[in-house]
């Protein structure tokens, strides 16, 4: 630690100058779970993910799990992955079988209706 005095961090903590990370996290969670704020913030992302899910189901896609969240886990033919990867950001989850892979598509607070429509057109 270069020129730092011995046990400097301990002295700072003892005098209350360094707040524990746990306290900061607790304050954030307390605010998020007050008056339904977390649900309000997440609602648009979840709504768009469910629109994506319904649109994919209508196109015949299968799902690894039935997710009520902003994350959807779809089963895709391996042959589609290179093309899909050049157009869409997705996460590899696992091989489903020799010919299929489970991928994760996620929406966020910044996802737009137009982006979901575009993704449905790509898929």
Can you describe what each PLM-predicted range is?
Residues 1-71, 75-76:
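Active-site C-terminal subdomain of aminotransferase-like
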Residues 50-51, 55-123:
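Conserved C-terminal alpha-helix-loop-beta "cap" of PLP-dependent enzymes
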């Amino acid at each position: 630690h270069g020129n730092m005095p011995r046990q400097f961090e301990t002295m700072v903590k003892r005098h209350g100058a360094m707040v524990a990370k746990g306290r900061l996290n607790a304050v954030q969670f307390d605010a998020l779970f007050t008056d339904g704020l977390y649900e309000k913030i997440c609602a648009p992302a979840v709504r768009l993910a469910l629109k994506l899910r319904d649109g994919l189901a209508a196109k015949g896609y299968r799902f690894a799990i039935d997710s009520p969240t902003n994350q959807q886990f779809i089963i895709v033919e391996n042959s589609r992955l290179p093309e899909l990867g050049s157009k869409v950001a997705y996460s590899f989850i696992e091989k489903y079988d020799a010919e299929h892979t489970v991928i994760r598509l996620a929406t966020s607070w910044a996802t737009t209706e137009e982006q979901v429509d575009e993704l449905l057109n790509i898929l």
